[in-house]
């Protein structure tokens, strides 16, 4: 597995990672814990890559966005505890057979990217040809970008439906089952309550 450490300062200096990569299908997230929801996303990523004859690429963030904003507020306790370290994430993603992981430096420059600038970066610097995203994925400054924005930009997007404890539910129903949604946040809450049976 190839690991790319992405710093916008480097990109703005004129350096590109495009020569390092084949064409890619990308998914984006914290992937903290690589739980069942993440695993479903990665399986869909690999399926899409196989169908489109592309390499698999995962973008994660360092620090994680909530950690960055907690530092800004000088309130580190407001950031959730990690389920996995960066090195553990990279190991898990390698074991899953991902071709490339992009570790994006989440800083003021990154959080200030407009949706268009973010999409430009994916296409021109990371050779992204399509994406696999969760149904609630937002990006860009003030979270103005979403899957529909990317489609209008010209990037095909496969949306994975919400993963719950017992089933995969349709996107339209996902808001009704938010309490059952598999997420790193929910796993932390269940662990804190000692509900290890549900966590596993």
Model region roles, listed by residue range:
Residues 1-200:
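Nucleotidyltransferase catalytic core that binds NTPs
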